[in-house]
């Protein structure tokens, strides 16, 4: 009876086709776990965010104290807040691993799925930035002032856009109110895009590590991969609990424990760690407009990846030179993240310029050239 119901009921049938009887390649590895982990962490972020919003006061005079009140007076408020703030870090760590897996195994050849994912990444970064502003601490205030002021670099309309976003001549109560509304709204838009992402994914099926035909050997998603996803969820929950309970302030900035003061500038303004790679690229270009364009290009360049795939082989599993270039790109990304957290002085300025240039050269020039070169080598007979 249950077997027939899940295949005939209009709603259960969708769940069955997506999570139970979904034909899945038999050889996908743990690297394919991050999709389900991202869905889980997104739901954790939405649920904890809704509970935090119940006690948040979007006013420049009471926002900081309302966050402190939530942590001190609300039943388990400290735990919910710790889950939300550290959950964002876990979320972005999984996102970067998910993107890295897509680059390594050429999942970007599903253009629709990949492009929706890149749009989700941009909206997630926008959502996280607005969320970072809400506590109205010292780093929140000055981070909002610096980043939003970058839009003034847009020719002709930049000086008009910035006061419109601020709701006045500077970052003020109207800015906080707008960011609160958008921070609450955007996760639900991201959730809709996630469903679109899954629809495109299930339309063509998942890639596999060997790059073989997707129809060669398939098994049902349940119970084989649901058990693997449950194990991944347990490990992810362990990481989140460790951060939330033992090291809740590890990934935060001490400056943000001080209420916002427009009359005192922090010695070093920097965003959260998951923005540091883009922040390093922004700082490495002395021209304001050039820096803004480079910062946004560091994200939207991912949209070009499918068009830069020149090799006839899909994954990098059998392409040792491409593997070397891939890990060079990963190390370059980590170097940019490290540089973005350092002060703007020597030698970090020069290092930032070198790593920023290498980031774009690797993606736009070296990877396509190496793919074309690999086409001239002898291909294994089963590719």
Swiss-Prot record:
The keyword Heme applies. Its main location: mitochondrion. Keywords: Electron transport, Heme, Iron, Membrane, Metal-binding, Mitochondrion, Mitochondrion inner membrane, Respiratory chain, Transmembrane, Transmembrane helix, Transport, Ubiquinone. GO terms for cellular component: mitochondrial inner membrane; respiratory chain complex III. It is found in: Mitochondrion inner membrane. Binds 2 heme b groups non-covalently. CDD domains: cytochrome_b_C, Cytochrome_b_N. Heme b b566 binds at residues 98, 197. SUPFAM superfamilies: a domain/subunit of cytochrome bc1 complex (Ubiquinol-cytochrome c reductase), Transmembrane di-heme cytochromes. Its cofactor is heme b. It is a multi-pass membrane protein. PROSITE patterns: CYTB_CTER, CYTB_NTER. Heme b b562 binds at residues 84, 183. GO terms for molecular function: metal ion binding; ubiquinol-cytochrome-c reductase activity. Component of the ubiquinol-cytochrome c reductase complex (complex III or cytochrome b-c1 complex) that is part of the mitochondrial respiratory chain. The b-c1 complex mediates electron transfer from ubiquinol to cytochrome c. Contributes to the generation of a proton gradient across the mitochondrial membrane that is then used for ATP synthesis. PANTHER family: CYTOCHROME B. Belongs to the cytochrome b family. This is Cytochrome b. It comes from Caiman crocodilus (Spectacled caiman). The gene is MT-CYB.
